[in-house]
Amino acid sequence: MKHLLNLLAAVALLIWGTHLVRTGILRVFGANLRQLISRSVSNRFTAVLSGMGVTAVVQSSTATALIVSSFVGQGLVGLPAALAVMLGADVGTSVMAVVFSLDLSWLSPLFIFVGVVLSISRKDTAVGRVGRVLIGLGLMLLALRLITESTTVLTQSPTVRTLLGALTSDLLLEIFTGAVLAVLAYSSLATVLLTATLAGSGGIPVDVALGLVVGANLGSGLLAVATTMRSNVQTRQVPLGNLFFKIMGVIIMTPLIGLWLKHVRPYVPDNASLVVLFHLAFNAVVGLVCIGLTGTVARAVQRLLPVADTQAAAGSRPRHLDPSALATPSLAISCAAREALHQADVVESMLLGLHQVIRTDDQKLAEDLRKLDDQVDELYSAIKYYMTKISREALN
């Protein structure tokens, strides 16, 4: 029981470390990363590269998906270019998984020590937030070492071996489990690193680990769809298109697991490296196959989620309250200010219409103005709720 609790604590530490890095990077460099994406979508190849770079820094393809989705929702980026960014984002998170699979545990004490010093001594500055990122990196490396130590002991238990053996006979169960873990951890990177560490320490068979990796990739696509479920139609189109790519990847790579073990395993004796390289291969293959399909998938998504059907209600919806900007308070406040201007435009329309109603006694226009009044109330509530979600600790 003690070793199981140690393992669960290490997994929680890994997830928390990933969260610290993601939020810290977005708070310090969020505006710069958004500018990088917006400037690099002129063609699909630079869009892929920008997605790789941003996700390698943020360590979360879901965060990149939220940023790109908000751009599409505001009409700043076309859907095909946004889908190309997401293909690069998935490759970027795979590259970071390869980096973290290396034995970098010796850097953990250094990162944590320097991070704590910077975070405490320069608390409300950008340097202090960089310290928060270093703490997150240190915790991730520490967690990976603790997971290795815990699983080495746990795998000696007959009960654990029996439970793990139940996974080896059902590939669909492995994919489902990996997807659920990615959604619960809010990070496919953390799930893949956990899986690779377990495989490297003998906690799970390698073929099971590869099935979990396939599921983790599918789970990251589902997570982005779920995160943007309440957003406008244009914003929801990007995660849905990326989910199509993930499903294609599952269809392509699942039958190749056996070939991977047969032809690659002799050259990569370390199981952890074998798992993260398969994760990289998964997203690289998806990127190469799907880079030419971004336009086709974009059209399919637009047919599934047509904008015209919801155009009538568009005026009452917030246009500028970007959820991905919440991690960067300065951007979030700018979004709220723009939405307040949108609200003011609606009020101006009401006042102009009021003069006409007084002069002409137009009952239909009067009814439209009553609806505009409801829109103003809805926008006010949305702005107020959005402002409450801005992280106070990131404000200075």
Model regions and ranges:
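Alpha-helical transmembrane segments
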Residues: 3-15, 98, 134-138, 204-214, ...
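Membrane-embedded alpha-helical segments and adjacent helix-loop junctions characteristic
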Residues: 5-58, 62-67, 124-199, 267, ...
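C-terminal ends of transmembrane helices
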Residues: 18-27, 68-73, 114-128, 224-231
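Internal alpha-helical transmembrane segments of multi-pass membrane proteins, especially GPCRs
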Residues: 50, 84-87, 135, 177-180, ...
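Membrane-interfacial helix-loop connectors
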Residues: 55-58, 67-94, 98-107, 115-119, ...
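Cytosolic, long alpha-helical scaffolding segments
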Residues: 77, 103-104, 204, 230-236, ...
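Cytoplasmic-side transmembrane-helix entry/capping segments in multi-pass membrane proteins
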Residues: 81-87, 106-111, 128-139, 239-244
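Hydrophobic transmembrane alpha-helical segments of multi-pass transport and channel proteins
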Residues: 95, 217, 221-222, 243-252, ...
